[in-house]
Amino acid sequence: GLVGSEMCIRDSCEAQWQKYDAETLNLNGMVVDGFNHQGYGLNRYCYSGKGTWSTCEYLPMGIAEDRETGETYIFQIESSGQWLAEYGSAQGGNLYLALSGATEQEHGWYKNLKPGESFTTVPAGAAVVKGGPNPAAAALTRYRRKVRRPNTDDEKLNVVFNDYMNCLMGDPTTERELSIIDKAAELGCEYYCLDAGWYDDGFWWDRVGEWKEASGRFPNGLKEVCDYVHSKGLKMGLWLEIEVMGVACELANKLPDDWFVCRHGKRHIDNKRYMLDFRNPEVRKYCRDVVDRLINDYGVEYFKVDYNVTMGYGSDLNSDSCADAIREHYECLHQWYEEIFRDHPELVVENCGSGGQRMDYGMLKILSLQSTSDQTDYLYNANIAANVASAVTPEQGGMWVYPYEDEEEHVIYNVVNGMLLRPYISGMVWKLGENSMNRMKEGISLYKEIREEVRDGVPFFPLGFGTLKSEVLAYGVKAEKNTYLSVWTPGTTEAVIPLENAEQVRRVSVIYPKEEMCGYKIENGNLVVKMPQEKAARLFKIEMK
């Protein structure tokens, strides 16, 4: 029998796996080949990405376990736009899996090839392993590292402070920024990213597009803030949503329609935004000039590039089909990024799409860091942290660490969320007392000690993938010498975690917090943990003989 799984994206609770038996999906392996009839089924089970948020419903990946052979198949479709994963019945009692980009049936995709022209579909990666989801996830992680653009950010795993989530929430001023920059430097962060709002004095949602500083927010200029970041030894970052212009943006209303995604003779509008069409070389040049200007004027070395609205099902302007316009847009966007990195090889670009709504390896082959969610609750964030290394490599998985209460276990839980991924620091740092700040500093310092092992290790999920109902969550990284394990107890005080090769374990210890503050032992091949309360988390180090 075969069990199929796919990754479901819920808004602000990304990376939640769903598991189905093949028979439940009406794809059973029974050979219906009676007298004079060669049996195969016509049923299929599909899931897909429908627009330009490639992962707003499902991630373009999946796992299939063959219980009869003990093999597991894992795959990903490397598309930033539309895609399709299809399971179906084949002859001889077999099942098939077909992976593709946009299709005519599901997406209305059509492309007319003229004589001498050729077409290549989006790439996909797949692996088959003996064993279950853990060796499969390890294999896909190694593959992702091989196909990714070599870059120093994913070698070093820089620690970034971002001023948005549970912090300034898009309302920056010079006064607010300077005090938070002090906190970021004190914590030991290496980059400081000024998020949304820096380009407009008021309600900015429908006015974005020119990316010029707001004088009301920064009376002495934005450069004063950037220079202060640099004076503290941090590198400067800015938020951009480069693929859009607001309907109230003065520049947008002076530009021709072919700069934008259009349908039925009009510009497509999504939530008071126009979508720039990167197939137009003038658009690409304008956006490149924006990036170069911000780098040259402010010393920016990091961009968080967001994508909060979509072009729906595409553009009918200068395209064989709306869906093909999406595909061509993304080909041009990927090339645009590659050209930027050729000229600015040390630049870091974070991939964001209202959190994880564009978390695909079309983008992540090129960009070094992924915003995994817009989730604002630290408890639900752990549900993402426990699973998301199945969707991205651990070092690319930007995980919010954003305490908003001055309480020790709250801070520890937040820090553990990020320790085996890429901790992405934010929160109400002005509320944190000395003890809470010290806990944050302790965690960031420890992360710098183990991040090379996070970079080289492979993920595993000793309890399987967590759900929103899980009382215990566990996620680990297995490195060459050591194994690290994050354990959360959102709904209980005791966790029982099976250990692989438990008889070979030489030592187990809690390494965050350093005082341990919990009980634990190895018993019957399990790590048994007694937490001091519900809603607690600890980071363990497991050393083998």
Where would I find each of the regions flagged by the language model?
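Short, small-residue-biased leader/transition segments that mark boundaries at the very start
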Residues: 2-9
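Beta-strand-rich recognition/accessory modules
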Residues: 37-150
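Histidine/acidic-residue-rich catalytic or RNA/ligand-binding cores of hydrolases
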Residues: 203-205, 248-253, 313-317, 358-368, ...
